[in-house]
From Swiss-Prot:
Protein purpose: Cytochrome P450 monooxygenase; part of the gene cluster that mediates the biosynthesis of fumitremorgins, indole alkaloids that carry not only intriguing chemical structures, but also interesting biological and pharmacological activities. The biosynthesis of fumitremorgin-type alkaloids begins by condensation of the two amino acids L-tryptophan and L-proline to brevianamide F, catalyzed by the non-ribosomal peptide synthetase ftmA. Brevianamide F is then prenylated by the prenyltransferase ftmPT1/ftmB in the presence of dimethylallyl diphosphate, resulting in the formation of tryprostatin B.
Membrane topology: Single-pass membrane protein
Localization in the cell: Membrane
Source species of the chain: Aspergillus fumigatus (strain ATCC MYA-4609 / CBS 101355 / FGSC A1100 / Af293)
Spans through the membrane: 12-32
Family of this protein: Belongs to the cytochrome P450 family.
Protein name (Swiss-Prot/TrEMBL): Fumitremorgin C monooxygenase
Biological process, per Gene Ontology: verruculogen biosynthetic process
Chain sites annotated for binding heme: 442
Keywords assigned: Heme, Iron, Membrane, Metal-binding, Monooxygenase, Oxidoreductase, Transmembrane, Transmembrane helix, Virulence
Pathway: Mycotoxin biosynthesis
A Pfam family that the UniProt record links to this protein: p450
C-alpha cells in the first residue's frame, strides 16, 4: 500500500498541474475568434486583476481609447463584468428590443439575491413595482410641488442659516440632505421627512450598499453566497436595514389604519400605501421597497444638483440671468409645477451640465437574451452584457463646439424647429442617454427635475454663492463653497 501511494500521489500532482496549465491556456487563448477587441486585455492576466484595476482608476481614458479605435463596438473589462460597449448610434434600435433585458443585466451585478442586497418581491414583481410606484408618484407631482418647496426652504435655512455674512458650507452634504428630505416628503409624507433617524438612513444607504456590493464582488462568485455573511460592510448594511424596518413598518401600519378608517378625508399620496395595495396580498418587504427606490433616486439627483452648483461657481456670469428668470416666473406664476416648466434657461444649464458630466460614463445596460444580429450586421452573442458609450454627447454635428460648456445651448434649441425636441431636460434621445432611453428610461427623472429646479430656485432667490478660493468647482464632492444670505436690497 505504501508503494502504491508513492506512485499515485506524484501522478495526481502532475495531472492537477496539467489541468491548471490547460485551463490557463483556454482562458488566455479562448477557442474561436472574437470579432470585438478588448481594450484592457493583458497577457497572463489570468483573473483580469490588472484589467479591473485599470478600469477602476482610468475608466474614462479606457472608454476614450476604445472610441478612438474607430470600431462601433468593443469590449471593456470593468470591476463588475466585461461589457460590450456600443456606440450611441445603436441606442434607437435597441431601446425597446425585448431580446435585450434591462433587469437581467443589472440584477446580477447588484447582487439582488443576497440578504441585505435583495429586492422586495419574489419573482418578477420586484422589477415591476418600483417603476409603477414612481409613475404613480409622477401623477401627483403637481400637488406635491408646494410641499417639496417647503422642505427645500426648511433644509436650506437649517444648514445655510439666514446669516448675511459669508460662511463656508459643504455642497455635497447640503445637497444630500436636501434630496433626502424632499424625496422622503414625496414618497412617505410629512411624518418621516424630518425624522433625523430616517434621514440618516436615507442619506447613507446608497453608499453603504455600494460599499457592501464592492466587498462581495472582490471575492470569487462561487464564494459570494456564503462570504457576505461575514464581511463587515454587509453586516453593517443589514443592521441599517433593521433600523429602517423599525421605522417603516410602524409607519405602514398607521397608513393602513388611516386608509381603512371610516372618515372620508382626502389623504396625500403615499408610496407605502400604493405599493401595499399593488401587492394585493402578495408577500413582500415594505422596507426594502422604499430603500430600493431611494437607492435609485438619490444618486442621479444629488449628482446633478452638485454639478450644477459647481458650474454656477465656475460660470458666475450665469447667476444673475438665472435669478432674473426665477424672479420673473415665480413673480408672475408663483412657485407651482406648471411655472417650473417655464424656467427654460435653468433647464438648459441643468441639461448642459448633465451632457458634459453625466452621473456615469457608460449607461443603458442590457443583457442579450439570445443571439442578436443588428441592422448593420453586428452580431451580439447570447449572454453578452452591453452598455452604451455616451459618445454622441460630443458629436460636433449635433452640438456646436461640444467640448465647451454653454449654459444657453438647450435654450437656443427651443427656437430651432429641427432641434426643439432635444431641449427639454426630461427628454431622452440617443444623443443624451443620461436617463437611459426607451421603455426602460428612468421614470424618476421628472421628480429629479422638479427637485433640482426647486433647490436652485431657493438658492438663487435667497443666497449668493461663490467657490472657496483655491477650490476646484468642477469636482463635486471634493470642494467647498462660501454662501451668504441675500439681503432685501439685492
Amino acid at each position: 500500500m505504501e508503494t502504491l501511494d508513492a506512485i499515485q500521489l506524484p501522478y495526481l500532482g502532475v495531472v492537477g498541474a496539467s489541468l491548471i496549465v490547460i485551463l490557463g491556456i483556454i482562458l488566455l487563448f479562448p477557442l474561436g475568434s472574437d470579432p470585438f477587441i478588448t481594450i484592457n486585455q493583458h497577457p497572463r492576466d489570468l483573473f483580469q486583476t490588472k484589467a479591473k484595476q485599470q478600469f477602476e482608476y482610468n475608466a474614462a481614458a479606457l472608454l476614450n481609447e476604445g472610441l478612438q479605435t474607430g470600431h462601433s463596438a468593443f469590449r471593456l473589462v470593468t470591476n463588475m463584468v466585461t461589457y460590450l460597449i456600443l456606440k450611441d448610434q445603436y441606442a434607437e434600435e435597441i431601446k425597446n428590443d425585448s431580446r435585450f433585458g434591462a433587469h437581467e443585466a443589472v440584477d446580477p451585478v447588484l447582487l439582488v439575491d443576497l440578504p441585505g442586497l435583495e429586492s422586495m418581491f419574489q419573482g418578477s414583481l420586484h422589477n415591476q413595482v418600483p417603476p409603477m410606484a414612481v409613475r404613480a408618484l409622477n401623477k401627483e407631482l403637481v400637488h406635491l410641488t408646494p410641499s417639496l418647496s417647503e422642505e427645500a426652504m426648511n433644509c436650506l435655512q437649517t444648514r445655510w442659516t439666514d446669516s448675511t455674512e459669508w460662511h463656508g458650507v459643504s455642497i455635497p452634504e447640503t445637497v444630500l440632505a436636501l434630496i433626502a428630505q424632499m424625496t422622503t416628503r414625496a414618497l412617505l409624507g410629512p411624518e418621516l421627512c424630518r425624522n433625523p433617524e430616517w434621514l440618516d438612513i436615507a442619506k447613507s444607504f446608497t453608499t453603504n450598499r455600494a460599499i457592501a456590493v464592492a466587498a462581495v464582488q472582490s471575492w470569487p462568485s462561487f464564494l459570494q453566497p456564503v462570504i457576505h455573511w461575514f464581511l463587515p460592510p454587509c453586516r453593517a448594511l443589514r443592521r441599517q436595514i433593521q433600523c429602517a424596518r423599525n421605522i417603516i413598518l410602524p409607519a405602514l401600519e398607521r397608513e393602513r389604519r388611516a386608509y381603512c378608517s371610516d372618515q372620508p378625508t382626502k389623504r396625500e399620496f403615499s408610496n407605502l400605501v400604493f405599493i401595499d395595495q399593488y401587492a394585493k396580498g402578495a408577500r413582500y418587504d415594505a422596507t426594502m421597497a422604499q430603500l430600493r427606490i431611494i437607492a435609485v433616486a438619490f444618486q442621479t439627483t444629488s449628482d446633478l444638483v452638485e454639478k450644477v452648483i459647481a458650474r454656477l461657481c465656475k460660470h458666475p456670469e450665469l447667476i444673475e440671468p438665472l435669478r432674473e428668470e426665477v424672479v420673473s416666473v415665480v413673480g408672475n406664476h408663483g412657485l407651482h409645477r406648471h411655472s417650473l416648466r417655464k424656467l427654460t434657461l435653468m433647464e438648459s444649464v441643468m441639461k448642459e451640465t448633465q451632457r458634459l458630466e453625466p452621473a456615469v460614463i457608460i449607461g443603458m445596460f442590457r443583457l442579450a437574451k439570445e443571439k442578436v444580429t443588428l441592422k448593420d450586421g453586428t452580431v451580439v452573442p447570447k449572454g453578452t452584457n452591453i452598455a452604451f458609450a455616451n459618445d454622441l454627447r460630443f458629436d460636433p454635428e449635433m452640438y456646436l463646439e461640444p467640448e465647451t460648456f454653454d449654459g444657453y445651448r438647450f435654450q437656443r434649441m427651443r427656437e430651432d424647429p429641427a432641434k426643439i425636441d432635444l431641449a427639454p431636460f426630461t427628454k431622452t434621445r440617443m444623443s443624451h442617454l443620461a436617463f437611459g432611453h426607451g421603455k426602460h428610461a428612468c421614470p424618476g427623472r421628472f421628480l429629479a427635475c422638479d427637485e433640482a429646479k426647486l433647490i436652485l430656485c431657493h438658492i438663487l432667490l435667497n443666497y449668493d454663492i461663490r467657490a472657496v478660493e483655491g477650490s476646484p468647482p468642477e469636482l463635486p464632492g471634493s470642494w467647498g463653497n462660501d454662501v451668504g444670505e441675500k439681503t432685501a436690497g439685492d
